[in-house]
Amino acid sequence: MAALIAENFRFLSLFFKSKDVMIFNGLVALGTVGSQELFSVVAFHCPCSPARNYLYGLAAIGVPALVLFIIGIILNNHTWNLVAECQHRRTKNCSAAPTFLLLSSILGRAAVAPVTWSVISLLRGEAYVCALSEFVDPSSLTAREEHFPSAHATEILARFPCKENPDNLSDFREEVSRRLRYESQLFGWLLIGVVAILVFLTKCLKHYCSPLSYRQEAYWAQYRANEDQLFQRTAEVHSRVLAANNVRRFFGFVALNKDDEELIANFPVEGTQPRPQWNAITGVYLYRENQGLPLYSRLHKWAQGLAGNGAAPDNVEMALLPS
């Protein structure tokens, strides 16, 4: 029984590791939904004033989406790899197609949160009703065979989202709210459909154009995840041991806890890596092959003696697709 449970946990671990991008996007979407709900309850207050309603409603949908989009670009490691590539290599090894695909990957990942925000805002309809209530045609409104009063129609319609109108206009207010919420939710569902189609077509195009088999792509993704995890863990240990050695040289001793003593005893650090080595393993990476053997990352390429030491020029390798 214990062996079966352990096997199931191992399977789930491998599954989630292979689907880390999908899970990350899902968590981003859920976080955005929660933030949108909190914003609607705490911060959203329609001014209910002509001209201001429109600006406030658009800002409530567009400004948070723009901020989330910029944050998504900033938090994406590919962004800074591309910046490093432009700084150190001037993208001399990147053709137009891989560069376009890499930018699409960065923008696509960054668009998850803003698209989710926009969809939830449209499905809720509050911002849309606030923005467009004053633009409803008064002549199209009827309630109990009564027509909407034409005097000060724009001002009256602009106050509908706040429900501050006389009771005799409550039926008109419900009709305006129902009509605008219908339009808002329709746009929200259309946006969901368009995004779903684009994601499907992008995945199909990616796998169709890829020269790698599905299994090798999965292996490549697992390798990148494992390499990044091990690199970060090792860099943390290396920097800690190096810092302890330098502090010891300055003071003559260093105050260490038991875990730090074990780290220094097990992982002696003799020196640091020069800047050219860091530059060699940093930047945009395309899948490459050297003499028929795959190179799965810049670190893999450097470890094989093909980068940073003049052993072989970059054009010996074959760029196939962006990681």
Swiss-Prot record:
What is the recorded membrane topology of this protein?
Answer: Multi-pass membrane protein
Subcellular location as annotated? Cell membrane
Q: What are the annotated disulfide bridges? A: C46-C130, C48-C162
Q: Which residues lie on this side of the membrane: Cytoplasmic?
A: 1-21, 77-101, 207-323
Chief subcellular location: membrane
Q: Which residues form the signal peptide?
A: none
**Keyword Cell membrane recorded:** yes
Q: Which GO BP annotation is one of this protein's?
A: ATP export
Could you give a GO molecular-function term held by this entry? Answer: monoatomic cation channel activity
| Keyword set includes Transport | yes
**Extracellular compartment segments:** 44-52, 133-179
Which region ranges are annotated with the description Hemichannel docking?
145-152
Q: For this protein, what reaction is catalysed?
A: ATP(in) = ATP(out)
Keyword terms:
Cell membrane, Disulfide bond, Ion channel, Ion transport, Membrane, Transmembrane, Transmembrane helix, Transport
Annotated function? Pore-forming subunit of Ca(2+) homeostasis modulator channels. Mediates ATP release from astrocytes and ATP-induced Ca(2+) influx in microglia thus regulating neuronal ATP and Ca(2+) homeostasis, synaptic transmission and neuroinflammatory response. May form intercellular gap junctions. The gating mechanism remains unknown.
Q: Which family does it belong to?
A: Belongs to the CALHM family.
PANTHER family in UniProt: CALCIUM HOMEOSTASIS MODULATOR PROTEIN, CALCIUM HOMEOSTASIS MODULATOR PROTEIN 2
Question: Quaternary structure per UniProt?
Answer: Homo-undecamer. Two undecameric hemichannels can assemble in a head-to-head manner to form a gap junction.
- Protein name as it appears in the record: Calcium homeostasis modulator protein 2
Species name: Homo sapiens (Human)
Lineage of the organism: Eukaryota, Metazoa, Chordata, Craniata, Vertebrata
**Gene that produces this protein:** CALHM2
